[in-house]
Structures are given as structure tokens and as C-alpha cells.
């Protein structure tokens, strides 16, 4: 049976400042930790990325032509405050006003994120969100943006609090490149959630028009053997690290006893302790019912198996299938079902996981209001042929995920839109320029854009709301 989506559904495309803009030092932009980190550790930098800083009119014209009626954009904090605080950079402010005006001219609704992995270097080198002073700096930056950019109707505080803590302090593939420090992971999650809560409360108390929410990456976790209680426990603990801890903070305003039991177990085994203060929970509790929406970024699911060895994580950054490894002491190890389809980067393709995650939010956090799927897409080594890409694999991936969104809506979940990652090809944080996701192919040498086969398919779905 052919499935459909609601008439008012947003068919969006997603971007992020650092991954798309380029112009990393242009017009007074301050440095971010990634600038030097990429130079020192990787085979690529964020120059020129997709040159969105100069070419946004082209991308927004294409968006309008191809039925894309929403775009996720992030503001580069260091374009507004080059050192994260203090003096404002007027050229950065002007750039975003121009960008949002172009969005509205093209009838593409901007969903604007305040922080997408790019804390200004001056604050990042001072502890980033492990330093509680950063909570104040973020709230001040948020307040400036709420006041200044009144043309924005949809605000997101953070993109992917989970993967920030994970990338910075567990896997160690994000600056500062620390590995296996679970206490820092949870502390980073917690302090960022307090920052989110404070910003949301300020937004509502000040009476700004528009809506505000947060974007969480929520990879669904399953036991490798559902009949083995140890595997079930491994999946529960892994879910706490990546999903439940931040969801509890968002919608319960505290951490449930079950969540804290899991956190305490993980820290007992791995060492470290958390600094959770009474005023933090006052802030979390005050914001728990104020979120207008939840953004869910979903690409994959994981299967967890009981494991009692030492922690070892190997990140597959070059698309060499089968080269990744993930096992955490006292938690478990990832073990894919034998027949699970995977990308070249070892991400397990499992659309049902998105359905399960949406329904989990609906069941466990009934105060959620509404959901946007703020990122979903297929990273691929695209072959550019005849000025296009015949990306049938991407079409199939997106189609199957849109179908389960349709199912979730039929089953009572309030899902209002979908943003494909990514609108045009952008650079990938820990994989460079080879891993492409876009609807529009970018020739990074010339910065020309070419619609892929998926763009024509997506246009038809957006026009008809019929998934076929």
C-alpha cells in the first residue's frame, strides 16, 4: 500500500555552518577548535566546504525549484562573537540577516540552530561545556540572537548534545580528542542540557514569538540476543549513554532512578564522578514542559552484546567497511546481526529503528508536543556521471524512512516534518569530502551544483505527499 504524509508536512534539507559555509576566517569570524584540529589530525579542512557563505542564494533557489520548503541552518557562534563573548562582529550579524531574508524570499522556512559542534576556540580551549562558565556565555549568546534575529520562527539550542560528548571524550575524534572518559561524557551532556534549559526558559519568559526546541541524535539500541538478560542490560546501558540521559533531562527535568542507576554503574566501573547541582535541576525542571518540538537525528541502530573486557573504539573514517570496533568496559560491545545492511562507514541501515525511537519518545515522554526528523540520509561515495548522480540507494533509504514516519503518524505520533541530511554535499567532520549526502552534488573544485536523481524524486514526494 502506498503511504502518504500530511499536507502541512515540511520537506526540508539540512546544513550546518562549519560544514557548509567555508569562509572560516572571513569578515571577522573568530577561530573554532576544529580549525587547528583538522589541520593537525586530518587530511582535509573546512575550506572551502560548500562555500555556502557566498553561494547560499544558489542553494536556496535550487531548494525552491525542488520543493524543499524548510532548511536547517546553524549560526556560527564565532561569526557573532569572535571569542564567544564580549564584542559583537557586525559583519557576521549582517550575513545571517541576509541569509534569513533570502530563505523567506524563496519560501524556504529556516530552522535555526545556535550551536552545531562549533564552540569558539577561546571558550573551547577553556574547557568547553565542562567549564560551567560556558553555560553563561551560551545563554548570553542565545539571548543576543533571539533579540537580533526576530525574523526567525524556529529556534534550536543545540545540535546533537550526545555526539558532542561522545566525539570529544569517548571516541576522541572531535577536539580535544580525549578517549574513554565516561565521566566527562555525562558531565558535558548535563551541562549542555542545563544551557539548553536556561535558554528555553529565557526565550519563553521574554515573550519572543516563534518556537524553540532541541535536536538530539537518537540511534536506537537493541540487544543482540533479546532472550539473554546480559545483552538486554548492555543495550539499556548503551541507550543511557546516548539517548536516555539527555531525553530525561529534556522532558523529565531530572534523571530517573533507573537512568542514574545505570550512570552510577558505568562510572563505578570506569571511574570518575559527576557534579550535579541543585540549581541545575531547578533549571531543567523549569524548562521540561516548554520545548515546542524535539528534533530527532536518526541514521542507524546498534545491537549490543554483553562484554567484560577493556574499552576499545576504532572509528571508521574512510569508508573501509568492517574496520570499526566499539566495546565499552562495563557496558557492552556492538555486534551487528549477520544479515544487517550497512553503509561503507559501518552504519547499520534499519528504518524500523526510527519508528521505534519515535514511539519510544511518545510513550516515555508524553509532554513532547511534536517531532521533526531533523536529519536522516545516506552517506555514499557518489559517482558523478553525465552531470548527475544516479543515487538509487539514497532514494531507497529515504523512501523507507519516510514510510516509517508515515506509520508513526498513523499510530498517533505528532511528526511535522523531515529534513534530509544534507541539502547539498557538505564536508563531514571526521570523514572529509568523500562521504556525500546531498540532494545536490557539489563539485568542490568549481563549487557548481548539480541535482542528483534523488533531488527529482524528493521534489515529486514533496509536491504530492505520496511516498513512492
Swiss-Prot record:
Kindly indicate whether the keyword Acetylation belongs to this entry: no
What this protein catalyses is:
a 6-phospho-beta-D-galactoside + H2O = D-galactose 6-phosphate + an alcohol
Q: Name one GO molecular function term.
A: beta-glucosidase activity
Positions binding D-galactose 6-phosphate in this chain are 19, 116, 159-160, 297, 428-429, 435, 437
- State which pathway it belongs to: Carbohydrate metabolism; lactose degradation; D-galactose 6-phosphate and beta-D-glucose from lactose 6-phosphate: step 1/1
- Pfam families attached to this UniProt entry: Glyco_hydro_1
- What name has this protein been given in UniProt? 6-phospho-beta-galactosidase
Identify its protein family: Belongs to the glycosyl hydrolase 1 family.
Biological process (GO) annotations?
lactose catabolic process via tagatose-6-phosphate
**What PROSITE patterns does the record tag this protein with?**
GLYCOSYL_HYDROL_F1_1, GLYCOSYL_HYDROL_F1_2
For the keyword Hydrolase, the answer is: yes
